[in-house]
Protein backbone atom coordinates (compact mmCIF):
# COMPACT_ATOMS: atom_id res chain seq x y z
CA UNK A 1 0.00 0.00 0.00
CA UNK A 2 1.28 3.48 -0.93
CA UNK A 3 2.41 5.38 2.14
CA UNK A 4 4.68 8.18 0.91
CA UNK A 5 4.75 11.30 -1.22
CA UNK A 6 7.34 12.22 -3.84
CA UNK A 7 8.27 15.90 -4.25
CA UNK A 8 9.74 16.55 -7.70
CA UNK A 9 12.21 19.40 -7.28
CA UNK A 10 12.25 22.11 -9.96
CA UNK A 11 14.82 24.21 -8.11
CA UNK A 12 12.48 26.36 -6.03
CA UNK A 13 13.85 28.04 -2.92
CA UNK A 14 11.03 26.43 -0.89
CA UNK A 15 11.37 22.86 -2.25
CA UNK A 16 12.84 21.42 0.95
CA UNK A 17 10.21 23.28 2.94
CA UNK A 18 7.46 21.40 1.07
CA UNK A 19 9.04 18.09 2.15
CA UNK A 20 9.37 19.30 5.74
CA UNK A 21 5.75 20.44 5.91
CA UNK A 22 4.50 17.10 4.57
CA UNK A 23 6.57 15.24 7.17
CA UNK A 24 5.25 17.52 9.91
CA UNK A 25 1.83 16.15 8.92
CA UNK A 26 3.26 12.69 9.67
CA UNK A 27 3.39 11.47 6.07
CA UNK A 28 6.76 10.24 4.81
CA UNK A 29 8.09 12.23 1.89
CA UNK A 30 11.16 12.12 -0.37
CA UNK A 31 12.55 14.65 -2.83
CA UNK A 32 13.66 13.61 -6.30
CA UNK A 33 15.06 15.66 -9.20
CA UNK A 34 12.40 16.80 -11.68
CA UNK A 35 14.07 14.71 -14.42
CA UNK A 36 13.79 11.40 -12.50
CA UNK A 37 12.66 8.74 -15.04
CA UNK A 38 8.97 7.88 -14.88
CA UNK A 39 9.73 4.18 -14.23
CA UNK A 40 11.70 5.14 -11.10
CA UNK A 41 8.77 7.24 -9.83
CA UNK A 42 6.35 4.35 -10.45
CA UNK A 43 8.72 1.93 -8.64
CA UNK A 44 8.60 4.21 -5.58
CA UNK A 45 4.82 3.57 -5.45
CA UNK A 46 3.92 7.04 -4.14
CA UNK A 47 0.46 7.84 -2.81
CA UNK A 48 0.87 11.40 -4.10
CA UNK A 49 3.25 13.57 -6.12
CA UNK A 50 4.03 17.28 -5.63
CA UNK A 51 5.64 19.48 -8.28
CA UNK A 52 7.68 22.18 -6.50
CA UNK A 53 8.07 25.78 -7.54
CA UNK A 54 11.13 26.92 -9.47
CA UNK A 55 12.82 29.98 -10.97
CA UNK A 56 12.21 29.00 -14.63
CA UNK A 57 9.57 30.00 -17.17
CA UNK A 58 7.86 27.16 -19.07
CA UNK A 59 8.81 28.99 -22.29
CA UNK A 60 12.46 29.42 -21.32
CA UNK A 61 15.19 27.55 -23.17
CA UNK A 62 15.94 24.28 -21.37
CA UNK A 63 13.03 24.82 -18.95
CA UNK A 64 12.64 21.85 -16.59
CA UNK A 65 9.81 19.52 -17.55
CA UNK A 66 8.38 16.06 -16.81
CA UNK A 67 7.30 13.07 -18.87
CA UNK A 68 3.65 13.89 -19.81
CA UNK A 69 2.76 10.25 -19.11
CA UNK A 70 2.96 11.14 -15.40
CA UNK A 71 -0.53 12.68 -15.74
CA UNK A 72 -1.96 9.31 -16.84
CA UNK A 73 -0.82 7.42 -13.72
CA UNK A 74 -3.94 8.48 -11.78
CA UNK A 75 -1.69 9.25 -8.80
CA UNK A 76 -2.85 12.53 -7.20
CA UNK A 77 -0.56 15.40 -8.25
CA UNK A 78 -0.33 18.85 -6.65
CA UNK A 79 1.47 21.49 -8.72
CA UNK A 80 2.82 24.50 -6.79
CA UNK A 81 3.74 27.80 -8.54
CA UNK A 82 6.01 26.70 -11.45
CA UNK A 83 4.52 23.23 -10.92
CA UNK A 84 1.06 24.63 -11.72
CA UNK A 85 2.33 26.50 -14.80
CA UNK A 86 4.06 23.36 -16.09
CA UNK A 87 0.91 21.27 -15.58
CA UNK A 88 -1.19 23.85 -17.45
CA UNK A 89 1.38 24.19 -20.25
CA UNK A 90 1.75 20.43 -20.81
CA UNK A 91 -2.00 19.76 -20.77
CA UNK A 92 -2.99 22.43 -23.29
CA UNK A 93 -3.58 25.50 -21.11
CA UNK A 94 -2.01 28.91 -21.73
CA UNK A 95 0.77 30.42 -19.57
CA UNK A 96 1.72 34.08 -20.00
CA UNK A 97 4.22 36.48 -18.42
CA UNK A 98 2.51 38.71 -15.84
CA UNK A 99 2.62 42.47 -16.44
CA UNK A 100 4.08 42.84 -12.96
CA UNK A 101 5.42 40.23 -10.56
CA UNK A 102 2.90 39.29 -7.86
CA UNK A 103 4.99 38.98 -4.73
CA UNK A 104 4.12 38.76 -1.04
CA UNK A 105 0.96 38.38 1.02
CA UNK A 106 -2.12 38.43 -1.19
CA UNK A 107 -5.87 37.94 -0.51
CA UNK A 108 -7.01 34.65 -2.10
CA UNK A 109 -10.66 34.40 -3.20
CA UNK A 110 -11.73 30.75 -3.03
CA UNK A 111 -14.39 29.80 -5.59
CA UNK A 112 -14.83 26.15 -4.61
CA UNK A 113 -14.46 25.20 -0.97
CA UNK A 114 -14.32 21.44 -1.03
CA UNK A 115 -11.52 18.94 -1.70
CA UNK A 116 -8.31 21.04 -1.62
CA UNK A 117 -9.89 24.05 0.11
CA UNK A 118 -12.25 22.16 2.44
CA UNK A 119 -12.70 23.93 5.78
CA UNK A 120 -11.28 27.28 4.56
CA UNK A 121 -13.02 30.66 4.38
CA UNK A 122 -14.10 32.33 1.14
CA UNK A 123 -11.14 34.70 1.50
CA UNK A 124 -7.76 33.66 2.90
CA UNK A 125 -4.26 35.15 2.78
CA UNK A 126 -1.67 33.42 0.59
CA UNK A 127 1.97 34.02 -0.34
CA UNK A 128 2.60 34.73 -4.02
CA UNK A 129 5.97 34.80 -5.77
CA UNK A 130 5.68 34.48 -9.56
CA UNK A 131 6.44 36.21 -12.85
CA UNK A 132 4.26 34.04 -15.15
CA UNK A 133 0.61 33.07 -14.67
CA UNK A 134 -1.91 30.61 -16.10
CA UNK A 135 -4.12 32.67 -18.44
CA UNK A 136 -6.30 29.72 -19.56
CA UNK A 137 -6.80 26.44 -17.71
CA UNK A 138 -6.48 23.18 -19.68
CA UNK A 139 -9.68 21.53 -20.89
CA UNK A 140 -11.50 19.66 -18.12
CA UNK A 141 -10.03 21.83 -15.33
CA UNK A 142 -12.15 23.82 -12.89
CA UNK A 143 -10.80 27.17 -11.61
CA UNK A 144 -11.05 26.98 -7.79
CA UNK A 145 -9.41 30.24 -6.62
CA UNK A 146 -8.31 33.66 -7.87
CA UNK A 147 -6.59 36.83 -6.63
CA UNK A 148 -6.98 40.45 -7.73
CA UNK A 149 -4.22 40.09 -10.35
CA UNK A 150 -4.26 36.32 -11.00
CA UNK A 151 -7.53 35.06 -12.50
CA UNK A 152 -6.48 31.42 -12.05
CA UNK A 153 -4.78 31.07 -8.64
CA UNK A 154 -5.83 27.40 -8.29
CA UNK A 155 -7.32 24.75 -10.58
CA UNK A 156 -8.25 21.09 -10.48
CA UNK A 157 -9.35 18.15 -12.60
CA UNK A 158 -10.89 15.66 -10.19
CA UNK A 159 -11.39 12.89 -12.76
CA UNK A 160 -7.63 12.85 -13.43
CA UNK A 161 -6.64 13.57 -9.80
CA UNK A 162 -4.76 16.74 -10.79
CA UNK A 163 -4.62 19.81 -8.52
CA UNK A 164 -2.57 23.01 -8.71
CA UNK A 165 -2.04 26.29 -6.86
CA UNK A 166 -0.14 29.39 -8.01
CA UNK A 167 0.75 30.40 -4.43
CA UNK A 168 3.00 28.72 -1.83
CA UNK A 169 1.03 26.72 0.78
CA UNK A 170 4.29 25.50 2.36
CA UNK A 171 5.42 28.89 3.74
CA UNK A 172 4.23 30.33 7.06
CA UNK A 173 3.02 33.46 5.23
CA UNK A 174 0.13 31.35 3.88
CA UNK A 175 -1.63 30.89 7.27
CA UNK A 176 -3.95 28.07 6.08
CA UNK A 177 -1.26 26.44 3.92
CA UNK A 178 -0.95 23.48 6.24
CA UNK A 179 -4.72 22.87 6.00
CA UNK A 180 -4.44 22.81 2.20
CA UNK A 181 -1.56 20.30 2.31
CA UNK A 182 -3.48 18.26 4.89
CA UNK A 183 -6.50 18.12 2.56
CA UNK A 184 -4.28 16.97 -0.30
CA UNK A 185 -2.54 14.27 1.76
CA UNK A 186 -5.42 12.89 3.82
CA UNK A 187 -8.55 13.51 1.72
CA UNK A 188 -7.28 13.44 -1.87
CA UNK A 189 -4.37 10.98 -1.60
CA UNK A 190 -6.01 8.97 1.20
CA UNK A 191 -2.74 8.74 3.15
CA UNK A 192 -2.57 7.97 6.87
CA UNK A 193 -0.56 10.20 9.26
CA UNK A 194 1.52 7.39 10.74
CA UNK A 195 5.13 8.46 10.11
CA UNK A 196 6.66 9.26 13.52
CA UNK A 197 10.14 9.30 15.01
CA UNK A 198 9.20 6.23 17.02
CA UNK A 199 8.38 4.28 13.85
CA UNK A 200 11.48 5.70 12.11
CA UNK A 201 13.73 4.58 15.00
CA UNK A 202 12.29 1.05 14.98
CA UNK A 203 12.83 0.71 11.22
CA UNK A 204 16.34 2.23 11.37
CA UNK A 205 17.39 -0.15 14.17
CA UNK A 206 16.22 -3.16 12.12
CA UNK A 207 18.10 -1.92 9.04
CA UNK A 208 21.32 -1.25 10.98
CA UNK A 209 21.21 -4.77 12.44
CA UNK A 210 20.77 -6.23 8.93
CA UNK A 211 23.58 -4.09 7.47
CA UNK A 212 26.12 -4.72 10.23
CA UNK A 213 25.41 -8.22 11.53
CA UNK A 214 28.11 -9.06 14.09
CA UNK A 215 30.74 -6.67 12.66
CA UNK A 216 32.45 -3.93 14.69
CA UNK A 217 31.56 -0.27 14.11
CA UNK A 218 33.34 3.00 14.96
CA UNK A 219 31.92 6.51 15.31
CA UNK A 220 33.73 9.87 15.48
CA UNK A 221 31.71 11.56 18.22
CA UNK A 222 31.83 15.36 18.41
CA UNK A 223 29.16 15.97 21.05
CA UNK A 224 27.05 17.84 18.49
CA UNK A 225 23.43 16.93 17.78
CA UNK A 226 23.95 14.90 14.60
CA UNK A 227 26.82 12.64 15.68
CA UNK A 228 25.23 12.16 19.13
CA UNK A 229 21.85 11.04 17.77
CA UNK A 230 23.49 8.81 15.13
CA UNK A 231 25.70 7.17 17.79
CA UNK A 232 22.81 6.45 20.18
CA UNK A 233 20.64 5.04 17.37
CA UNK A 234 23.42 2.68 16.21
CA UNK A 235 24.13 1.69 19.82
CA UNK A 236 20.45 0.74 20.28
CA UNK A 237 20.88 -1.60 17.30
CA UNK A 238 24.25 -3.26 17.97
CA UNK A 239 25.21 -2.45 21.57
CA UNK A 240 28.86 -3.05 22.46
CA UNK A 241 29.87 -3.67 18.84
CA UNK A 242 29.93 0.13 18.53
CA UNK A 243 32.93 2.11 19.79
CA UNK A 244 32.82 5.91 19.81
CA UNK A 245 36.00 7.97 19.63
CA UNK A 246 35.83 11.44 21.18
CA UNK A 247 38.83 13.69 20.56
CA UNK A 248 39.26 16.63 22.96
CA UNK A 249 41.39 19.01 20.90
CA UNK A 250 41.41 21.66 23.63
CA UNK A 251 39.11 23.91 21.63
CA UNK A 252 35.78 22.88 23.17
CA UNK A 253 33.36 24.97 25.21
CA UNK A 254 33.33 24.93 29.00
CA UNK A 255 32.16 21.58 30.40
CA UNK A 256 31.62 20.06 26.94
CA UNK A 257 34.06 17.15 27.21
CA UNK A 258 32.76 16.24 30.67
CA UNK A 259 29.15 16.27 29.42
CA UNK A 260 30.00 13.93 26.52
CA UNK A 261 31.65 11.44 28.89
CA UNK A 262 28.77 11.69 31.37
CA UNK A 263 26.09 11.22 28.70
CA UNK A 264 27.58 8.47 26.56
CA UNK A 265 29.73 6.50 28.99
CA UNK A 266 27.61 6.78 32.13
CA UNK A 267 24.02 7.30 30.92
CA UNK A 268 24.08 5.15 27.77
CA UNK A 269 26.84 2.74 28.90
CA UNK A 270 28.58 3.02 25.53
CA UNK A 271 32.14 2.07 24.63
CA UNK A 272 33.79 5.49 24.54
CA UNK A 273 37.44 6.12 23.80
CA UNK A 274 38.27 9.56 25.21
CA UNK A 275 41.40 11.05 23.65
CA UNK A 276 42.97 14.01 25.44
CA UNK A 277 44.87 15.59 22.55
CA UNK A 278 44.88 19.17 23.85
CA UNK A 279 48.64 19.55 24.02
CA UNK A 280 49.39 18.23 20.54
CA UNK A 281 46.69 20.37 18.88
CA UNK A 282 47.77 23.56 20.67
CA UNK A 283 51.43 22.84 19.89
CA UNK A 284 50.59 22.55 16.17
CA UNK A 285 48.60 25.81 16.33
CA UNK A 286 51.33 27.80 18.12
CA UNK A 287 52.08 31.02 16.25
CA UNK A 288 49.43 30.38 13.56
CA UNK A 289 47.22 33.42 12.86
CA UNK A 290 45.61 32.69 9.48
CA UNK A 291 42.08 31.21 9.91
CA UNK A 292 42.30 28.93 6.86
CA UNK A 293 45.61 27.54 8.09
CA UNK A 294 44.13 26.95 11.56
CA UNK A 295 41.25 25.03 10.00
CA UNK A 296 43.56 22.87 7.88
CA UNK A 297 45.88 22.06 10.79
CA UNK A 298 42.96 21.05 13.03
CA UNK A 299 41.33 18.97 10.27
CA UNK A 300 44.58 17.17 9.44
CA UNK A 301 45.42 16.53 13.09
CA UNK A 302 41.90 15.27 13.83
CA UNK A 303 42.14 12.70 11.03
CA UNK A 304 45.59 11.58 12.23
CA UNK A 305 44.39 11.09 15.82
CA UNK A 306 41.20 9.33 14.71
CA UNK A 307 43.10 6.94 12.41
CA UNK A 308 45.56 6.09 15.20
CA UNK A 309 42.77 5.32 17.67
CA UNK A 310 40.65 3.39 15.14
CA UNK A 311 43.69 1.23 14.26
CA UNK A 312 44.03 0.22 17.93
CA UNK A 313 40.50 -1.24 17.82
CA UNK A 314 41.50 -3.93 15.32
CA UNK A 315 39.51 -4.96 12.27
CA UNK A 316 36.60 -2.53 11.87
CA UNK A 317 34.48 -2.43 8.72
CA UNK A 318 31.89 0.27 9.42
CA UNK A 319 31.99 3.98 10.21
CA UNK A 320 28.96 5.94 11.51
CA UNK A 321 28.41 9.39 10.00
CA UNK A 322 25.73 11.96 10.86
CA UNK A 323 24.84 12.86 7.26
CA UNK A 324 21.45 14.62 7.05
CA UNK A 325 18.83 14.71 4.28
CA UNK A 326 19.73 18.21 2.97
CA UNK A 327 23.25 16.88 2.20
CA UNK A 328 21.74 13.94 0.28
CA UNK A 329 19.36 16.24 -1.61
CA UNK A 330 22.18 18.64 -2.43
CA UNK A 331 24.33 15.91 -3.94
CA UNK A 332 21.36 14.35 -5.73
CA UNK A 333 19.72 17.31 -7.46
CA UNK A 334 21.49 19.94 -9.48
CA UNK A 335 18.64 22.38 -8.88
CA UNK A 336 18.45 22.07 -5.09
CA UNK A 337 19.79 24.59 -2.61
CA UNK A 338 23.31 24.08 -1.32
CA UNK A 339 23.39 23.23 2.37
CA UNK A 340 26.82 22.20 3.57
CA UNK A 341 28.83 22.65 6.72
CA UNK A 342 31.96 24.67 6.02
CA UNK A 343 33.46 23.60 9.34
CA UNK A 344 33.21 19.81 9.19
CA UNK A 345 36.35 18.62 10.96
CA UNK A 346 34.85 15.15 11.08
CA UNK A 347 35.15 15.05 7.28
CA UNK A 348 37.22 11.90 7.19
CA UNK A 349 39.27 11.12 4.06
CA UNK A 350 37.69 9.08 1.28
CA UNK A 351 40.53 6.55 1.22
CA UNK A 352 39.67 5.24 4.70
CA UNK A 353 38.54 1.64 4.15
CA UNK A 354 35.18 1.87 5.91
CA UNK A 355 31.65 1.17 4.76
CA UNK A 356 29.40 4.02 5.88
CA UNK A 357 26.41 3.78 8.18
CA UNK A 358 24.34 6.95 7.75
CA UNK A 359 21.21 6.37 9.84
CA UNK A 360 20.05 10.02 9.70
CA UNK A 361 20.40 10.55 5.96
CA UNK A 362 16.62 10.72 5.43
CA UNK A 363 16.02 13.29 8.20
CA UNK A 364 15.95 17.08 8.43
CA UNK A 365 17.58 18.82 11.40
CA UNK A 366 14.32 19.36 13.30
CA UNK A 367 13.52 15.65 12.90
CA UNK A 368 16.98 14.70 14.22
CA UNK A 369 16.26 16.72 17.38
CA UNK A 370 12.87 15.00 17.73
CA UNK A 371 14.55 11.60 17.29
CA UNK A 372 17.18 12.52 19.91
CA UNK A 373 14.45 13.20 22.47
CA UNK A 374 12.70 9.94 21.48
CA UNK A 375 15.98 8.06 22.12
CA UNK A 376 16.41 9.66 25.56
CA UNK A 377 19.24 12.11 24.86
CA UNK A 378 19.33 15.06 27.31
CA UNK A 379 17.85 18.34 26.06
CA UNK A 380 21.21 20.06 26.60
CA UNK A 381 22.61 17.99 23.70
CA UNK A 382 19.47 17.80 21.56
CA UNK A 383 18.96 21.59 21.53
CA UNK A 384 22.66 22.49 21.38
CA UNK A 385 23.46 25.25 18.91
CA UNK A 386 25.63 24.45 15.87
CA UNK A 387 29.33 24.48 16.77
CA UNK A 388 32.15 24.65 14.19
CA UNK A 389 34.43 21.63 13.88
CA UNK A 390 37.57 23.70 14.59
CA UNK A 391 35.81 24.82 17.78
CA UNK A 392 37.00 27.92 19.59
CA UNK A 393 39.97 28.18 17.21
CA UNK A 394 37.80 30.18 14.79
CA UNK A 395 36.43 32.33 17.62
CA UNK A 396 39.84 33.35 18.99
CA UNK A 397 41.04 35.76 16.32
CA UNK A 398 44.77 35.76 15.69
CA UNK A 399 47.12 33.42 17.54
CA UNK A 400 45.59 30.85 19.92
CA UNK A 401 46.93 30.67 23.48
CA UNK A 402 45.76 28.89 26.64
CA UNK A 403 45.05 32.29 28.22
CA UNK A 404 42.84 33.45 25.34
CA UNK A 405 40.94 30.15 25.28
CA UNK A 406 40.29 30.37 29.04
CA UNK A 407 38.96 33.93 28.69
CA UNK A 408 36.71 33.02 25.76
CA UNK A 409 35.40 29.86 27.46
CA UNK A 410 34.26 31.79 30.54
CA UNK A 411 32.69 34.64 28.54
CA UNK A 412 30.87 32.20 26.24
CA UNK A 413 29.60 30.20 29.23
CA UNK A 414 28.14 33.34 30.85
CA UNK A 415 26.48 34.43 27.59
CA UNK A 416 24.83 31.03 27.03
CA UNK A 417 23.91 30.70 30.72
CA UNK A 418 22.02 34.01 30.65
CA UNK A 419 20.31 33.17 27.35
CA UNK A 420 19.07 29.89 28.84
CA UNK A 421 17.89 31.51 32.08
CA UNK A 422 15.98 34.22 30.19
CA UNK A 423 14.36 31.81 27.69
CA UNK A 424 16.24 33.23 24.70
CA UNK A 425 18.51 30.24 23.99
CA UNK A 426 15.85 28.20 22.18
CA UNK A 427 14.73 31.28 20.22
CA UNK A 428 18.16 31.63 18.59
CA UNK A 429 19.77 29.46 15.90
CA UNK A 430 23.27 30.12 17.18
CA UNK A 431 24.81 32.27 19.90
CA UNK A 432 28.43 32.56 20.99
CA UNK A 433 31.21 34.84 22.21
CA UNK A 434 34.22 35.85 20.11
CA UNK A 435 37.61 37.06 21.32
CA UNK A 436 38.82 39.57 18.69
CA UNK A 437 42.53 40.27 18.68
CA UNK A 438 41.76 43.62 20.26
CA UNK A 439 42.64 45.28 23.55
CA UNK A 440 41.39 48.64 24.74
CA UNK A 441 41.72 51.06 27.64
CA UNK A 442 39.26 50.89 30.53
CA UNK A 443 38.79 51.95 34.14
CA UNK A 444 38.02 49.36 36.83
CA UNK A 445 37.89 50.62 40.39
CA UNK A 446 40.29 53.55 40.28
CA UNK A 447 42.75 51.64 38.10
CA UNK A 448 43.41 52.13 34.41
CA UNK A 449 43.15 48.81 32.54
CA UNK A 450 44.29 47.61 29.14
CA UNK A 451 42.34 44.43 28.47
CA UNK A 452 40.51 42.32 25.89
CA UNK A 453 37.17 43.04 24.22
CA UNK A 454 34.53 40.29 23.95
CA UNK A 455 32.12 40.35 20.99
CA UNK A 456 28.76 38.61 21.36
CA UNK A 457 26.93 37.12 18.36
CA UNK A 458 23.36 35.75 18.30
CA UNK A 459 21.49 34.96 15.08
CA UNK A 460 18.25 33.45 13.82
CA UNK A 461 18.31 31.26 10.72
CA UNK A 462 16.48 28.40 8.99
CA UNK A 463 19.52 26.60 7.62
CA UNK A 464 22.63 28.73 8.18
CA UNK A 465 22.67 29.96 4.56
CA UNK A 466 21.26 33.37 5.55
CA UNK A 467 20.91 34.76 9.07
CA UNK A 468 19.62 37.80 10.92
CA UNK A 469 20.94 39.13 14.23
CA UNK A 470 18.71 38.59 17.26
CA UNK A 471 17.15 41.67 18.86
CA UNK A 472 18.03 40.73 22.45
CA UNK A 473 16.52 43.03 25.13
CA UNK A 474 18.86 45.79 26.33
CA UNK A 475 18.34 44.69 29.94
CA UNK A 476 19.58 41.19 29.08
CA UNK A 477 22.61 42.52 27.17
CA UNK A 478 23.39 44.81 30.11
CA UNK A 479 23.28 41.86 32.53
CA UNK A 480 25.48 39.68 30.29
CA UNK A 481 27.99 42.51 29.82
CA UNK A 482 28.18 43.24 33.56
CA UNK A 483 28.73 39.56 34.37
CA UNK A 484 31.46 39.09 31.74
CA UNK A 485 33.40 42.21 32.76
CA UNK A 486 32.92 41.43 36.45
CA UNK A 487 33.69 37.68 36.35
CA UNK A 488 36.17 37.17 33.51
CA UNK A 489 39.67 38.36 34.30
CA UNK A 490 41.33 40.15 31.39
CA UNK A 491 38.15 41.63 29.82
CA UNK A 492 37.04 45.27 30.14
CA UNK A 493 34.68 45.75 27.20
CA UNK A 494 31.73 43.85 25.63
CA UNK A 495 30.22 44.60 22.20
CA UNK A 496 27.23 43.06 20.37
CA UNK A 497 27.48 42.16 16.67
CA UNK A 498 24.44 43.48 14.77
CA UNK A 499 25.38 42.32 11.25
CA UNK A 500 23.22 39.96 9.20
CA UNK A 501 24.44 37.24 6.79
CA UNK A 502 25.03 38.44 4.13
CA UNK A 503 27.10 40.64 4.20
CA UNK A 504 28.86 39.01 7.18
CA UNK A 505 29.23 35.28 7.82
CA UNK A 506 27.85 33.86 11.08
CA UNK A 507 31.31 32.94 12.41
CA UNK A 508 34.00 35.61 12.51
CA UNK A 509 36.63 33.36 10.95
Curated annotation (Swiss-Prot):
Sequence ranges assigned to domain GMPS ATP-PPase in this UniProt record: 195-384
Class of enzymatic activity (EC top level): ligase
Annotated positions binding ATP: 222-228
Location of the active site: 81 (nucleophile), 168, 170
InterPro entries with a match to the protein in the record: Class_I_gatase-like, GATASE, GMP_synth_C, GMP_synth_GATase, GMP_synthase, GMPS_ATP_PPase_dom, NAD/GMP_synthase, Rossmann-like_a/b/a_fold
Any one annotated GO CC term: cytosol
Catalyses which reaction(s): XMP + L-glutamine + ATP + H2O = GMP + L-glutamate + AMP + diphosphate + 2 H(+)
Sequence ranges assigned to domain Glutamine amidotransferase type-1 in this UniProt record: 4-194
Sorted UniProt keywords: ATP-binding, Glutamine amidotransferase, GMP biosynthesis, Ligase, Nucleotide-binding, Purine biosynthesis
Pathway: Purine metabolism; GMP biosynthesis; GMP from XMP (L-Gln route): step 1/1
Matching Pfam families: GATase, GMP_synt_C, NAD_synthase
GO molecular function, one term: GMP synthase activity
Enzyme Commission number: 6.3.5.2
Described function: Catalyzes the synthesis of GMP from XMP.
Subunit organization: Homodimer.
Protein name: GMP synthase [glutamine-hydrolyzing]
Organism: Carboxydothermus hydrogenoformans (strain ATCC BAA-161 / DSM 6008 / Z-2901)
